[in-house]
Amino acid sequence: MSGGGVIRGPAGNNDCRIYVGNLPPDIRTKDIEDVFYKYGAIRDIDLKNRRGGPPFAFVEFEDPRDAEDAVYGRDGYDYDGYRLRVEFPRSGRGTGRGGGGGGGGGAPRGRYGPPSRRSENRVVVSGLPPSGSWQDLKDHMREAGDVCYADVYRDGTGVVEFVRKEDMTYAVRKLDNTKFRSHEGETAYIRVKVDGPRSPSYGRSRSRSRSRSRNRSRSNSRSRSYSPRRSRGSPRYSPRHSRSRSRT
């Protein structure tokens, strides 16, 4: 997931474009950017604020995977008392269409469930701070290779699945006992170990709440399939504080 900022350029395809409705009457383009910038580089924001009708907007990302994350993370988001409606335009794709991007594809998934693309190359992570989200964990573990699934649980543990076994092995060797930083700036040293026989509890009772309310938006637990691989080396940490004026 790349950095924020609006990049003006030629229009892309509908996979990168999302619809944002139920906006407050005094909404500005900059406010919309503040709500969505953390999901990735924004190519364009087209705010429609016609007199006599409620405002709405189209936001276009550089990467279709960032658009998918924005739909999942911000649909139903409470912005100054307005519950945002965020979806792909009806002329484009639907949110239930494939399980990810990056050339990997994937099986269809439910809107609120993780993608069906899974891997046996799984590690268990412990010692996560309370504000650590699946996206924070995924970003941290990408230093080892291509992550196809990540999730976090209430007890400070998480699971990460890699596309390749060698990346899983590398993650245990290089990321065990490293400093983890959440999007809220909390830090902790985490432990990374190869998972044993799969526990049926993962992904159910121990999963963090998927509440989409303003004060729990960090807990949206959904993984997009396949992630671009970063070069191996020392992990990079960049806390992502939301600049939205809708704060807790």
Swiss-Prot record:
PTM entry text: Phosphorylated by CLK1, CLK2, CLK3 and CLK4. Phosphorylated by SRPK1 at multiple serines in its RS domain via a directional (C-terminal to N-terminal) and a dual-track mechanism incorporating both processive phosphorylation (in which the kinase stays attached to the substrate after each round of phosphorylation) and distributive phosphorylation steps (in which the kinase and substrate dissociate after each phosphorylation event). Asymmetrically dimethylated at arginines, probably by PRMT1, methylation promotes localization to nuclear speckles.
This protein's record includes keyword Acetylation: yes
Modified residues (N-acetylserine): S2
Modified residues (Asymmetric dimethylarginine): R93, R97, R109
UniProt remark on domains: The RRM 2 domain plays an important role in governing both the binding mode and the phosphorylation mechanism of the RS domain by SRPK1. RS domain and RRM 2 are uniquely positioned to initiate a highly directional (C-terminus to N-terminus) phosphorylation reaction in which the RS domain slides through an extended electronegative channel separating the docking groove of SRPK1 and the active site. RRM 2 binds toward the periphery of the active site and guides the directional phosphorylation mechanism. Both the RS domain and an RRM domain are required for nucleocytoplasmic shuttling.
Glycyl lysine isopeptide (Lys-Gly) (interchain with G-Cter in SUMO2) cross-link site: K30, K38
GO BP terms in the entry: mRNA 5'-splice site recognition; mRNA transport; regulation of RNA splicing
Domain RRM intervals: 16-91, 121-195
Gene: SRSF1
UniProt name for this protein: Serine/arginine-rich splicing factor 1
Native species: Pongo abelii (Sumatran orangutan)
Compositionally skewed regions (Basic residues) per UniProt: 205-248
Annotated stretches, region: Disordered: 88-134, 191-248
